[in-house]
């Protein structure tokens, strides 16, 4: 049973708690400043600056945790504070969070500082927040009524949907001109009419729009919901900027599946200015009820909060399940030992202690590759990973074959201990956790002809989008790619990735002799960063169905000129345009040049109906 002091008598306890909260408040202030700067970068088309903001922000959390830990060590000798004082520190911290707007994130920051200062064998659940202590329900921003979490709009007035949406756009106060906002709003109204058709407008017909834009890649997104009667529908509108500095509304997304892809774990984190992050998460969860809160926090750039919630969800699942962790099905990797819990939709990846030929790498190099992916634009084609250290699992839940594999291939990563209740635990010293997907090689082997064709189209698109983002996957075997539940192909094996601009793209030289021509070995010199696209045929086109689909849709994949073209554009400073939605949904592809007149007519019809 937890023991808590009846009297908070320590000044040091209060001072330590105050120092921790000051550290978090500094972190969140800097976090929000990045989102404000992202708006300026978007308005001016500073795409490199936008990417740099994204990379810098990822490092902020750990920097503030280190900073707070150093202060506590230097000023309070925190490592030697006794148990009674630590319990008081936690209670003081809870008191300081009264009326705080980010209490859940502050609690996570508190945990991070504690676990950094105290060895895992010392700190216990009395010292940290295993569960949240402060509710995030109904937190309101009373200090700034001009910027609530969301604004409500009522298109059922005589002004109609067009005028309503014009107010929505203008309220974001973007400091850049629109190319033709009237045209774009006409497109929006037309698309909404096509999607919903004839529907009866209820008395509560309204649109709620989150007060901050969502910035990512070269786009800013308006995110909201449409409420009519007892129905709620998602609303997302990407805003793009052209080379002339003019803005346009690119499309309108009205289906839950589209929003799920927009907030997928395969995309980089959004930059959003949120005073009350829990309110944004609640709003988004209303639109995506199947999406875990952990993933929503992560997609909003609060990856440590997402990581904390994921672990709580994981412990809850362990408590309410009984199946065992097993070696993940499929082809075993040379670098990673992968295991899974069948009842849980994730895989756990442990770096092996040694790597058989032809792998030439190290543990630190592999970790640096995963960190590169964390910092880089994943463009919807690379799975995000959660990285944990010293994770304790119930030993009884591990299959015997899995334990043998761990002890054989990663003995330095495994140790055993007794839990607080006396049970046996296996501790994994370092592990990556990723969403479980269907391996592409299995998809292609077992799928119908239509599924094979879809898989190959997606595979080729995924590679092309990755190299457009300056990522060369390295090992492009189908087993290193997965298929998500939305049918998208995603890369998830990062130990051989390189920047495309660091690669030397070559064609295989003509053989000089008959011996070279007949040789089964590579007879020409190959440097460490040389790539030969024409040789990919050998290991990608073995299956006749795969070959037919590949040559039909991606014949240029095996031409060095295609790869070189992407590299040259990157070296010239060009940034590719990526869309987190089907390009067919874009207004330019849906309506083309003749759309404005038709859109205006649809706008009038909807206005009349709304009135």
Curated annotation (Swiss-Prot):
Active site (record annotation): 384
Coiled coil: none
Source domain of life: Bacteria
Molecular functions per Gene Ontology: [isocitrate dehydrogenase (NADP+)] kinase activity; AMP binding; ATP binding; phosphoprotein phosphatase activity; protein serine/threonine kinase activity
EC number(s) per entry: 2.7.11.5, 3.1.3.-
Binding residues annotated for ATP, in chain numbering: 328-334, 349
Family to which the UniProt record says this protein belongs: Belongs to the AceK family.
Protein name: Isocitrate dehydrogenase kinase/phosphatase
Gene assigned in the entry: aceK
């Amino acid at each position: 049973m937890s023991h808590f002091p009846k009297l908070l008598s320590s000044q040091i306890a209060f001072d330590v708690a105050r120092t921790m909260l000051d550290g978090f408040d500094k972190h969140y202030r800097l976090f929000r400043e990045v989102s404000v700067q992202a708006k300026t970068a978007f308005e001016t088309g500073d795409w490199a600056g936008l990417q740099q903001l994204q990379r810098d922000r990822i490092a902020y959390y750990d920097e503030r945790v280190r900073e707070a830990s150093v202060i506590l060590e230097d000023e309070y000798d925190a490592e030697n504070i006794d148990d009674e004082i630590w319990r008081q520190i936690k209670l003081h911290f809870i008191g300081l969070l009264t009326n705080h707007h980010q209490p859940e994130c502050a609690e996570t920051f508190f945990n991070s500082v504690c676990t950094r200062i105290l060895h895992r064998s010392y700190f216990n659940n009395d010292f940290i927040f295993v569960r949240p202590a402060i509710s995030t329900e109904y937190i309101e921003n009373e200090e700034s009524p001009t910027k609530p979490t969301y604004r409500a709009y009522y298109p059922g007035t005589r002004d109609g949907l067009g005028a309503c949406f014009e107010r929505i756009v203008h309220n974001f106060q973007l400091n850049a001109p629109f190319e033709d906002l009237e045209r774009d709003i006409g497109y929006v109204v037309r698309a909404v009419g096509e999607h919903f058709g004839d529907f009866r407008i209820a008395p509560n017909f309204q649109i709620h729009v989150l007060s901050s834009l969502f910035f990512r890649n070269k786009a800013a997104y308006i995110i909201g919901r449409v409420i009519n009667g007892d129905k709620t529908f998602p609303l997302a509108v990407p805003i793009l900027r052209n080379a002339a500095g003019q803005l346009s509304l690119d499309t309108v997304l009205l289906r839950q599946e589209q929003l799920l892809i927009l907030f997928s774990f395969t995309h980089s984190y959004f930059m959003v200015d949120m005073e009350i992050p829990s309110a944004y998460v609640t709003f988004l969860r209303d639109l995506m009820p199947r999406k875990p809160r952990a993933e929503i926090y992560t997609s909003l750039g609060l990856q440590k909060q997402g990581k904390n919630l994921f672990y709580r969800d994981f412990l809850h699942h362990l408590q309410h399940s009984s199946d065992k962790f097993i070696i993940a099905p499929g082809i075993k990797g040379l670098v990673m030992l992968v295991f899974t819990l069948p009842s849980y939709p994730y895989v756990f990846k442990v770096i092996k202690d040694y790597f058989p030929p032809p792998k030439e790498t190290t543990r630190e190099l592999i970790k640096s590759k995963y960190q590169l992916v964390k910092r880089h634009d994943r463009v919807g084609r690379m799975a995000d990973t959660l990285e944990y250290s010293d994770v304790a699992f119930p030993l009884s839940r591990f299959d015997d074959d899995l334990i043998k594999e761990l002890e054989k291939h990663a003995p330095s990563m495994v140790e055993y201990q007794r839990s607080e209740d006396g049970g046996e635990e296996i501790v994994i010293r370092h592990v990556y956790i990723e969403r479980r997907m269907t391996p592409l090689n299995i998809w292609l082997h077992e799928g119908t002809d239509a599924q094979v064709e879809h898989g190959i189209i997606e595979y080729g698109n995924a590679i092309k989008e990755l190299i457009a983002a300056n990522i060369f996957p390295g090992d492009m075997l189908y087993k290193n790619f997965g298929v998500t539940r939305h049918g998208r192909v995603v890369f998830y094996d990062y130990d051989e990735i390189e920047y495309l601009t660091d690669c030397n793209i070559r064609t295989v030289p003509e053989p000089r002799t008959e011996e070279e021509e007949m040789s089964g070995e590579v007879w020409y010199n190959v440097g460490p960063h040389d790539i030969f696209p024409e040789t990919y045929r050998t290991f990608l086109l073995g299956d006749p169905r795969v070959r037919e689909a590949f040559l039909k849709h991606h014949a240029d994949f095996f031409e060095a000129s295609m790869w070189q073209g992407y590299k040259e554009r990157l070296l010239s400073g060009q940034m590719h345009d990526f869309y987190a939605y089907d390009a067919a949904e874009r207004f330019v592809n849906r309506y083309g040049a003749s759309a404005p007149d038709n859109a205006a007519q649809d706008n009038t019809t909807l206005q009349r109906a709304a009135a």
